[in-house]
Amino acid sequence: MEKKITVIKGDGIGPEIVTEAQKVLDKVAEKFGHKFVYTDILMGGCSIDKYGVPLTDEAVEIAKNSDAVLLGSIGGNTSTSPWYKLAPNLRPEAGLLKIRKELGLFANLRPANLYPELREACPLKDDIIGDGFDMMIMRELTGGLYFGARKTENVDGVETAVDTLTYNENEIRRIAIRGFDIAMKRRKKVTSVDKANVLDSSRLWRKVVN
């Protein structure tokens, strides 16, 4: 099997951890007879330093034409880095939002596992831990607050910031389907978390998921 992997080392510890991850992939390729072809692109602060933008259109096209993306770390110290003196759409994290949108990466999967042998290291109560737990937490990535309209303005002499939380039923449905598909391979249980007692977006979320 031959696969093309776009490598984004990014900023901070990104280059260090991605280099080690590539070593692991190389061992996998060696053991199972695969071939991984790596193409490096810049994203985040390192791209700003070289090109003046957090992610170029050319880099996006390379990622689109690959089978997978290996991503390190994006951004730096928000208090000291000159990147954060730029307009919000030119800061490192804007590149991350752009590539998520362009590649349709709407579902963030975060496994949470605790094995019985590690229960003493967990801050949760014993009656919650039981014999350990194995959860998959899924977060929607390309809708909601991160992609809604935003503005900062002066209202009656008071500086006011507005972020718009927007979801449509298609965005909700696709991540719900992904959650159900994953659950069918696990314990066949899905818990949808919302704030339907307050938010219209959550009421729509609950309506679609249910």
Regions picked out by a protein language model, each given a short descriptive name:
Residues G10-G12, M43, I74, L114, ...:
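Short, ordered loop/turn segments at secondary-structure junctions
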Residues D49-V162:
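N-terminal glycine-rich phosphate/adenylate-binding segment common to multiple enzyme folds
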Residues T6-K23, K27-A29, G157-N210:
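Glycine-rich phosphate/diphosphate-binding loop of Rossmann-like nucleotide-binding domains
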Residues C46, N77-T78, V198-D200:
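Short, active-site-adjacent cap segments at secondary-structure transitions
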Residues M1-I5:
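Extreme N-terminal starter segment of soluble prokaryotic enzymes
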Residues G33-D57:
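N-terminal beta-loop-helix "entrance" segment that forms/cooperates
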Residues D26, E30-H34, N65-A68, K101-N108, ...:
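Generic secondary-structure signature for well-ordered alpha-helical cores
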Residues V37-I41, R110, T191:
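General small-molecule cofactor/ligand-binding pocket signal
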